């Protein structure tokens, strides 16, 4: 299954919430109607969405937020289910610990897609070593750095400047002048932003 490459705003409208696929710092709320479905006038339906439909919709939303395809998402859920604790919370923690997401949270990319591209293009160092696997799991204490040659990229500087203005998550420490950040710890559920109801995903996979 290929990644979606169409209009990002359409995906946010489909889910009824801003997925921040275009920018983490600029909301789409002022640009388009997030409470209406894609289409000329917004498709409507008189039928009430079933429990299964709501569960499936929530899974699709989270997949789109993190840019993960179905097979990989199932693997994340299976791993979360094996771990002790709340399965839904563990799932989100695994997704948040992906290298591309950490690069995004540190403000080096304005979106997760842009952060993923930086990783794939070998612009990212982890503990001083090039790592070009977006799905790599980052551990507490790992240091993320922009490769020296890539520090000149205007898009990185602009994304970092915007991130500084809006603030960084508490579970990362960023030195913008050095283009460097430290993954302090796996975030608690309360530290993970986003309008996500992970319990619906757990219910879906428990059917």
From Swiss-Prot:
UniProt-listed NCBIfam families: PRK05327.1, rpsD_bact
SMART domains: Ribosomal_S4, S4
Entry-linked InterPro entries: Ribosomal_uS4, Ribosomal_uS4_bac-type, Ribosomal_uS4_CS, Ribosomal_uS4_N, S4_RNA-bd, S4_RNA-bd_sf
Gene name of the record: rpsD
Protein name: Small ribosomal subunit protein uS4
UniProt GO MF annotations: rRNA binding; structural constituent of ribosome
GO CC annotation: small ribosomal subunit
Tagged with keyword Transcription: no
């Amino acid at each position: 299954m290929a990644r979606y490459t169409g209009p990002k705003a359409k995906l946010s409208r489909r889910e009824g919430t801003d997925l921040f696929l275009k920018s983490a710092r600029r909301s789409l709320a002022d640009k388009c109607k997030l409470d209406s479905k894609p289409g000329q006038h917004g498709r409507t339906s008189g039928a009430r969405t079933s429990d299964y439909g709501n569960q499936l919709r929530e899974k699709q939303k989270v997949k789109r937020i993190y840019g993960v395809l179905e097979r990989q998402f199932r693997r994340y859920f299976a791993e979360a289910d094996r771990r002790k604790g709340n399965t839904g919370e563990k799932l989100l923690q695994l997704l948040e610990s992906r290298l591309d997401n950490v690069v995004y949270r540190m403000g080096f990319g304005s979106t997760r897609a842009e952060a993923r591209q930086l990783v794939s293009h070998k612009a990212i160092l982890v503990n001083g070593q090039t790592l070009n696997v977006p799905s790599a799991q980052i551990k507490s204490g790992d240091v993320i750095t922009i490769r020296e040659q890539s520090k000149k990229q205007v898009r990185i500087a602009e994304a970092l400047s915007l991130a500084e203005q809006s603030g960084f998550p508490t579970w990362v420490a960023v030195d913008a002048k050095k283009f460097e950040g430290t993954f302090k710890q796996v975030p608690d559920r309360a530290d993970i932003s986003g309008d996500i109801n992970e319990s619906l995903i757990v219910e879906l996979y428990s059917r």
